[in-house]
Amino acid sequence: AFTTYGTQLFLPFSNYRVSFDTINVVDPFYTVPLLIGLITSLSINRFKRSRTKPVLIGLALSTIYLIVTIGVKQKIENVFDANLAKQGVIYDDLLTVPVSVGSINWYGVGKTDESLFIGKFNVMHGNEIEFMEFPINDSLLSTIDHKLASTLKWFSKGYYAVAKRGDKIRLYNMQCDMQGVRTYGNYRVPTAFYFEVIPLDDG
């Protein structure tokens, strides 16, 4: 639940994904202590009482790391909020997600009714954030299957941008795939990964 993908904790009563967005999906600062603790424990005679100690130490270190990332995220949100306000952006919702190990690099997405404002911040450098604006283009989803559109919105938790390329509709998901703004010639997109759908002739 601490990653951007989240966990559906309330199934089968609700398909809501709980996600605290404090660590990357692959973060060795969390997994390595657990693995070292487990491997060390397996190397100890199973009849010794001390066998569980390495596992508990690894679990404690990983848990402490998770708690620290919660505090880091709160500070990061304050930084993005201040930078958005400084640049005159009045947003409705704010998403902040780590994009590297150790929760060092973060992307922030300020969402308005019509646009997403995306910026990057490095904890070590403390840089001023430059935001890029992308229109949401929600109306383009009306050209594809309603159920599919609803599923795509659910998966992105509302943080998406839609674009039309030729006869295809692309949905860029900022919640689960924030890799940063990409530029291809004169074409700029909010992140590298996207879902691509070909609308039916009847819409």
Language-model features and meaning:
Residues 19-26, 41, 66-70:
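Flexible, glycine/proline-enriched loop segments at strand-loop-helix junctions
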Residues 25-58:
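Cytosolic-side transmembrane helix boundary signature
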Residues 34-44, 79-86, 103-120:
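Juxtamembrane/interfacial segments around transmembrane helices
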Residues 49-74:
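Internal/C-terminal transmembrane anchor helices
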Residues 72-92:
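Alpha-helical transmembrane signal-anchor/signal-peptide segments
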Residues 90-93, 100-203:
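Extracytosolic and intramembrane catalytic regions of membrane-associated proteins
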